[in-house]
Amino acid sequence: MVREEVAGSTQTLQWKCVESRVDSKRLYYGRFILSPLRKGQADTVGIALRRALLGEIEGTCITRAKFGSVPHEYSTIAGIEESVQEILLNLKEIVLRSNLYGVRDASICVKGPRYITAQDIILPPSVEIVDTAQPIANLTEPIDFCIDLQIKRDRGYQTELRKNYQDGSYPIDAVSMPVRNVNYSIFSCGNGNEKHEILFLEIWTNGSLTPKEALYEASRNLIDLFLPFLHAEEEGTSFEENKNRFTPPLFTFQKRLTNLKKNKKGIPLNSIFIDQLELTSRTYNCLKRANIHTLLDLLSKTEEDLLRIDSFRMEDRKHIWDTLEKHLPIDLLKNKLSF
């Protein structure tokens, strides 16, 4: 059936989700095809996407737990079936869904006897638990049990040195890897000069995002990696010239908005969405979290407003500046702005 759909190598490159299912709350599966590809291209794309999916997708997890006066992680607490180490391992397995950046606080505070599950975690509004039935501990006696938690969004596997903290807090090895597994296979079709390849890509995720969302994020990350090479020829500058390249100082978006409103061309700012501005995935996500969706939303913010956004850096500010400079009319760029 696939061979009939891909008749020749001259056909436009297309992708399609051919299978999608939810095996459990913490196991999503998706199967995608990309075709038609020339010989060797399927392997190139498959390797790049697999690496990006397994190592470049961001995830949210619990990174620290504070128990109070507990001497070490191998201690046992009266009235609790599990040891501190077992509780830490259970917390490590909790799957969270969120777009937050930076560190956030959470907590558990319950009274026994009862089972403690992920549903008992008190989270900030921006964080959601994927599987509320995940076990944490079993209180066998009528005791008060409270834990302070730290939550962080990151990528990859982060480990911390084990040491005793005076305040009773213990680090949890963070596994910020929403994609559990990726497989790809290649099928050759056609004859002679019309021979081409079809890439099949299988993605399993932990439920914090769908395979389609993971594929989208991995693709954006790969595009961001190659953007500097695309812009190098446009800039027409050598490496020596780049050393002394001017970095714009602090600027005020409000002034630029005023200049835009005076522009005779009447640009429909509310019709230009930020995903049309070729922003990096990091800058794009920062703006989306701040409910900035259009160019009008962006230019309505002062620089102070932007710098207050979680994880918004000076590099993001410069990237936005360069993007606006690229997309705004030339006559507007000649206007004097307040710095």
UniProtKB/Swiss-Prot annotation:
Main localization (coarse): plastid
UniProt key word Chloroplast: yes
Any single Gene Ontology cellular-component annotation: chloroplast
Localization, UniProt: Plastid, Chloroplast
Keywords, alphabetical: Chloroplast, DNA-directed RNA polymerase, Nucleotidyltransferase, Plastid, Transcription, Transferase
EC number(s) on file: 2.7.7.6
GO MF entries: DNA binding; DNA-directed RNA polymerase activity; protein dimerization activity
Keyword Transferase: yes
Task performed by this protein: DNA-dependent RNA polymerase catalyzes the transcription of DNA into RNA using the four ribonucleoside triphosphates as substrates.
Comment on protein domains: The N-terminal domain is essential for RNAP assembly and basal transcription, whereas the C-terminal domain is involved in interaction with transcriptional regulators and with upstream promoter elements.
Subunit note: In plastids the minimal PEP RNA polymerase catalytic core is composed of four subunits: alpha, beta, beta', and beta''. When a (nuclear-encoded) sigma factor is associated with the core the holoenzyme is formed, which can initiate transcription.
Stored HAMAP family: RNApol_bact_RpoA
The protein's name in its UniProt record: DNA-directed RNA polymerase subunit alpha
Provenance organism: Aegilops tauschii (Tausch's goatgrass)
